[in-house]
Amino acid sequence: MIQNTLYWHDYETFGLDPARDRPEQFAGIRTDEDLNIVGEPLNIIARPTPDTLPHPMSSLITGITPQQALEQGLPEAEFIAHILMKLSQPGTCGVGYNSQRFDDEVTRNPLYRNLHDPKGREWQHGNSRWDIIDMVRDCHDLRPEDTVSYTHL
């Protein structure tokens, strides 16, 4: 029997456009449905490609310079292979914040560029995805006194 798990993940990118800008960093952690951590977390940096320029603000936000990413980062094919391995494990629900509009697109583009099925991980082997941004908004709308204000994030 497949164990259903949640894979909480987030990207930092070299810009704001998921179709054009490349991933800079990926972090993810797997939990069971009771939110107990399962396995080891993943935190990897991507090597910038020579055909793109990172937005200068990306380094200020993440603290990772292009030089640091060149030295410590993985080539895109290896970077996305690590991510695909985590997200395509049977029974995985990929969970993110604003992931349907951003992170899923950031994942799909390097998968496509590296000749992987860009959407298979989302539905094959009992897998799914969940963008919690709407849940967070609903919680804020229902109980604004008990949630963090968007202006303080």
Where are the language model's segments positioned?
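Conserved DEDDh/DEDDy metal-dependent 3′-5′ exonuclease domain
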Residues: 59-143
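Short, surface-exposed acidic-centric catalytic microdomains
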Residues: 40-62
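Conserved beta-strand scaffold positions in the cores of enzyme catalytic domains, especially
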Residues: 6-8, 41-43, 127-129
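Entry/capping segment at the start of metal-dependent catalytic domains
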Residues: 1-36
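Conserved small/polar residues in nucleotide/adenosyl-binding loops
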Residues: 151-152
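Short, flexible loop/turn elements at secondary-structure junctions
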Residues: 13, 48, 134-136
